[in-house]
Amino acid sequence: MESQQLSNYPHISHGSACASVTSKEVHTNQDPLDVSASKIQEYDKASTKANSQQTTTPASSAVPENPHHASPQPASVPPPQNGPYPQQCMMTQNQANPSGWSFYGHPSMIPYTPYQMSPMYFPPGPQSQFPQYPSSVGTPLSTPSPESGNTFTDSSSADSDMTSTKKYVRPPPMLTSPNDFPNWVKTYIKFLQNSNLGGIIPTVNGKPVRPITDDELTFLYNAFQIFAPSQFLPTWVKDILSVDYTDIMKILSKSIEKMQSDTQEANDIVTLANLQYNGSTPADAFETKVTNIIDRLNNNGIHINNKVACQLIMRGLSGEYKFLRYTRHRHLNMTVAELFLDIHAIYEEQQGSRNSKPNYRRNPSDEKNDSRSYTNTTKPKVIARNPQKTNNSKSKTARAHNVSTSNNSPSTDNDSISKSTTEPIQLNNKHDLHLGQKLTESTVNHTNHSDDELPGHLLLDSGASRTLIRSAHHIHSASSNPDINVVDAQKRNIPINAIGDLQFHFQDNTKTSLKVLHTPNIAYDLLSLNELAAVDITACFTKNVLERSDGTVLAPIVKYGDFYWVSKKYLLPSNISVPTINNVHTSESTRKYPYPFIHRMLAHANAQTIRYSLKNNTITYFNESDVDWSSAIDYQCPDCLIGKSTKHRHIKGSRLKYQNSYEPFQYLHTDIFGPVHNLPKSAPSYFISFTDETTKFRWVYPLHDRREDSILDVFTTILAFIKNQFQASVLVIQMDRGSEYTNRTLHKFLEKNGITPCYTTTADSRAHGVAERLNRTLLDDCRTQLQCSGLPNHLWFSAIEFSTIVRNSLASPKSKKSARQHAGLAGLDISTLLPFGQPVIVNDHNPNSKIHPRGIPGYALHPSRNSYGYIIYLPSLKKTVDTTNYVILQGKDSRLDQFNYDALTFDEDLNRLTASYQSFIASNEIQQSNDLNIESDHDFQSDIELYPEQPRNVLSKAVSPTDSTPPSTHTEDSKRVSKTNIRAPREVDPNISESNILPSKKRSSTPQISDIESTDSGGMHRLDVPLLAPMSQSNTHESSYASKSKDFRHSDSYSDNETNHTNVPISSTGGTNNKTVPQTSEQETEKRIIHRFTSDRILPSSESNSLHHVVPIKTSDTCFKENTEESIIADLPLPDLPPEPPTELSDSFKELPPINSRQTNSSLGGIGDSNAYTTINSKKRSLEDNETEIKVSRDTWNTKNMRSLEPPRSKKRIHLIAAVKAVKSIKPIRTTLRYDEAITYNKDIKEKEKYIEAYHKEVNQLLKMKTWDTDKYYDRKEIDPKRVINSMFIFNRKRDGTHKARFVARGDIQHPDTYDSGMQSNTVHHYALMTSLSLALDNNYYITQLDISSAYLYADIKEELYIRPPPHLGMNDKLIRLKKSLYGLKQSGANWYETIKSYLIKQCGMEEVRGWSCVFKNSQVTICLFVDDMILFSKDLNSNKRIIAKLKMQYDTKIINLGESDDEIQHDILGLEIKYQRGKYMKLGMENSLTEKIPKLNVPLNPNGRKLGAPGQPGLYINQQELELEEDDYKMKVHEMQKLIGLASYVGYKFRFDLLYYINTLAQHILFPSKQVLDMTYELIQFIWNTRDKQLIWHKSKPVKPTNKLVVISDASYGNQPYYKSQIGNIYLLNGKVIGGKSTKASLTCTSTTEAEIHAISESVPLLNNLSYLIQELDKKPITKGLLTDSKSTISIIISNNEEKFRNRFFGTKAMRLRDEVSGNHLHVCYIETKKNIADVMTKPLPIKTFKLLTNKWIH
């Protein structure tokens, strides 16, 4: 069999390297490997390669060593060798060996005779001997022996003289490695098979097919020994040969057994790689086959993922299924199951189409492809069924529409082809004649053809479901075809002109008719094999004929190129003319929807989803066939590319593949972490990490900043370290695109050192995963170490370094080695490592005294980099030291904050640890804390000073008994102090040094004196202390006392009548800074008020006799005027002060130096004269009482985040309060929701439903109001872009709980040319509303509240404006013209105001009060208008109802509250929650609103603590140092300040006038969000939260005379603002009810207190006059206007007739104007005592008691 196949190729040269056996293999029962031909070729190639590598060597080296034979070869016999012959390793029987010659000379070998070796070999030379067969047995080969005299000397003669009788077999290659033995055995077995010895090869069961002879065994052994040297044999083979060196059969048996186990896996892989499916078999069977293969491979450890499996499956799809390649090629995450769903869908569709056709017989061996047979046909590639070719697809499908002209193309006369042809007619080109056939052109062909077409023939197409032809001369019974849609393999439409019949007249004189479609738009005339099968005709490609099922041959098949053809000579021509067919056009009904249109209509879904939905009828109205899918594959939607753009995917392992060529320390990853805030200056704020790609060795370096020179120093260090320590050069450094890496300095450094920087792409942090993961791991370790050890935060980098040391020593699960091992370093000696934070005792080698202890408690951090020592932290010295002189402290707590220092014997160390703590805690305060059994959780870390030292005079007085302290009490206090365990603070001073172990020079802190009042919650008493400051102005405002005030400031003497006091420093909490308070006796604690005995405090005798009475200024007027002034003050909500005797100052204050005022600083309580005058004796409060006086930031408030962060040192901001006015671009706080927030992504189902309902309500209202012109839509290109306004929907929840949607225009981007900037949108002023409410209470008015729905839409718009339609209309490319004033337009408010104003005046009989917009009145009703909200006031409720009826005639008016009840009625009017009972009272508050809003601000509240007594305390200054923040952090804090101050301003403006000073001061610092400012803001919000239930209380006035009384109380605080600006404040009262307040910084810099007071009064007069006019318009009663101030000098100037005083004053002009205003407007100027001046809360921070005293009458 083998020789027969070889004889068919006589032209192959025996000496050629490619002369390999390509025939089929021997019978399967003799071939246990079942190796395919492709594998044989691989083996032959490997053999050829091995043989070609053999070179000519000396004879002594040609024979391999044989350890199994002890006898050497005879010396006379030349050893076998590979001589210098061209035909290497080829042998034949023509070359005989000497008789009886033994190849190895072994005595046991069977003797050989000539011609007894394999005749299939030809020896390369006479000296190269090969194994022989014994002559007694005869040759086992089936071929005869060649002639003996035929010898070949070289390749040329071999090629020329070779005869067909010589048979050549390629020998196996030489074995060169034990690892190559499995592959070598395969070639060895193939060698035996080709030598006709396949029967002796063991089968699967280990036994040969036939017995093996001795000669064959000898041949087997000798061949094995030649080509398999013993030194290259595997161990298991050597083990077999050591037992029996001739047992080659056992080696073959075991090798085959091993190969069988690998064959299944190899077959599965080959099968999976060569999958083919076209629908000819059931889809279920194909799926089962594929899944079984994948499962077997997965079970054997060969994992085939979904992506690879899907690619292999799709590569083998053909026919109808090939389309899945294009629809699936972009789906990276598809699964095998999803792919088979699509395959099943197409298969089921095919089966349904076949069932609808007539049954016909088909040859299953020939028909392999099925295609769709329904109307929407497909023309896939032609599949030629040539069993000897694997690539049978049409290669020229792209030329289907490019038919070229070829008029001289020859054709084939198929009559000369025999019916019994067994070989395919192969035409290489049109001019190639094969087997004597002649090509002639068909006479019926009148159509141009392409170059690769066989003219005059029909192309046999197994994939086409219909027959198509280009020429009309063969179509019978042609007719138009409006209902047939045909697409090609690329799913492109093929227009069809006509349909008819194609009639064949075959060789057996039978006629057959097929349906044919006419189209000139194809490259070939196609004959569908499916339609032939329908008429019982099949194509047999083995015989190359068309035949019927009974075997009758009808016509021959010609193979030309890659395709098969049938001659057109069998077609019968028709009489139809060509123009008749070509004039047939497609009906209009065949028009299809373009795919881009459907893609856009269906929300830009992908083509596969759309087709699947159409197939399953999930979309109705049209079918899949109604869509033109021809462009679906190649269509790129630009909107999808933009809207669905994603980042590229990171392929796992791609980095390793790219970087695997680098050696250790050649590729580094680096990244920077930081900053870490709130650290001392000596502690690093950043660290930079490096990771080696190969070894994963890590380095970390501390950084104090990210400047380029700092980064450059680190790079220089790490490169030098790697070069010197590891003898390596860094080639690449990967880093992100931070400015610290991309700067020019570092770039030049890397370029100079030949290092390639590898940057990540934009927004691709995942590409920097190595460095990012390292930083995350180190930070996790750092947080854990600090938490476990309790060490302070400034040691954070020590924790990082400790973690790096340990991580470099731990083995990686992937590499099974540590980074140190990869780097060639020794492992970490754990005996030298201590737990992080381990308590130790360090030897002090330089104690202060020889008798002092020499041990200092400390905490171990990490091994030293620079020595064999250990880095240890010493809390008592606030330093870290590098030492080996330490002892581990056994059995002690490991945490610093749990360390029991009292258990140690180092008393001196204990004193050092607690020194700073003792500096700010007095003994009496500890005694009070113990007496009350109060545990203070206050953290003193912010109050610690570096090495504080108590002033000796203060400490001596603090611990010595005084006259006011009983000795027994002092003794008890001392005992309690000694028993108190004082713990070292967690945070340290910012000036800690880590390099010097010696204590720094100690400094003392200067005690400060401040004024502190008691709270409601304390219970303990503390004295009020005057805060001494430079007094530049007297309190009585007389200029003659200024010099005396200055003398007092420098005076060292006080009154001698006071009890001695001792000043001790205390901790600052609750909004106050460090203060010094005097110790007093209990008898002194009841003393409250002390007057400053200075010349500027001298009062008239009347005031001295009765301080608690208000004393009007006496003039020359009558007693009636004096009574008027008294009546003005009579019913005001002023505090009631009991008379108290004056007290004197203590002598102890004589020793205290004056403290200079920081008058250039912004202060929450500057040092004005009225503020400097404070009380001395008051209740003294213990330290623990301050624990709820919150003065900590958000970070330090929450105990879980005690380690706060300091601002990074990146950007400096200068504190300029004036910058607040310049900034106009601060984004307002957005309280509304967008559509996606309210509906699309809203997870609250109930809220979402309410917003949807509101949305539909708004849309209906827009349509109802005819907001836009619905008759015409405009194209966007036709309209000027300036007149196009963007629009959007916004959603919010109203105060009453209803949900509202509003369609608004984007007025913020409206062009200035589209509106009149002079028009204004007016709303009612808050003072007008408060005035109307106050008059309503006094006159028993009814209050009715209305709302006009969609108010702006009632106003027409004059300008020509266009908007984009709402989204639900689906007309994004169109515009509509506005007809109404849409919300959001800049002119809408003004248009609505003019519309409603005109209607109220003309239709309702109202008139607008002059100077007060949106306040309308008539004789019975007053209306306050705020956009669409109306508040009606009238004495008769029917009058309100009449107005309501008229409003409803024009507007959609809704009654919110009619107000007809005589009981208490609750209103919600413009944000105010009002409780009103006619004729009795009115309460104004915002409790519900604040309860809802404040928690949403994310402010750290303290709900469980005691309430604050005041929003701030006096004596606290805002530090004006430069603020250093990162840009993002700065913007975040400014935004937070905006939210907090915005809410506070809203509340203060509405009714909390007592907070206006604090709000105004903090509002000036919105752009300066320092930690201190944020702390104050949090404290303010906390106070608002604690007092959210407070209300502004009004009671109905009961005047003696029917008059209205309007009073303004004024006050000023001189020079307590930056740049010596003064704070002024005014409170307005109507009939004793506070209706408004104002606190602001004076616009002018005043030179004295009197000038500041004059400025404050002059600022209040204009508003006072306007309010007077409004009151007279609304209530026709006489009005009395009063002006109250506590500055007598101001009053004397105003009422003085001596004009000479004004000439010597800077404020003379203002004073003159003020005097004219007072006299011209009949203002009554009165004096009010400072202690009763409620306007004092508008100008300065007050002590808690004073604050409550001045506000509890009107806010409670």
UniProtKB/Swiss-Prot annotation:
Region (Disordered): 1-93, 126-173, 352-421, 956-1088, 1142-1173
Recorded domain comment: The C-terminal RNA-binding region of CA is sufficient for all its nucleocapsid-like chaperone activities.
Biased amino acid composition, Polar residues: 1-10, 48-60, 127-152, 1005-1017, 1031-1043, 1054-1082
Primary location group: cytoplasm
Catalytic reactions on record: DNA(n) + a 2'-deoxyribonucleoside 5'-triphosphate = DNA(n+1) + diphosphate; Endonucleolytic cleavage to 5'-phosphomonoester
Location of this chain's protein in the cell: Cytoplasm; Nucleus
Composition bias, Basic and acidic residues: 1044-1053
Site keyed Cleavage: positions: 401-402, 582-583, 1218-1219
Motif, Bipartite nuclear localization signal: chain positions: 1179-1213
Name of the featured protein: Transposon Ty1-BR Gag-Pol polyprotein
Other notes: Retrotransposons are mobile genetic entities that are able to replicate via an RNA intermediate and a reverse transcription step. In contrast to retroviruses, retrotransposons are non-infectious, lack an envelope and remain intracellular. Ty1 retrotransposons belong to the copia elements (pseudoviridae).
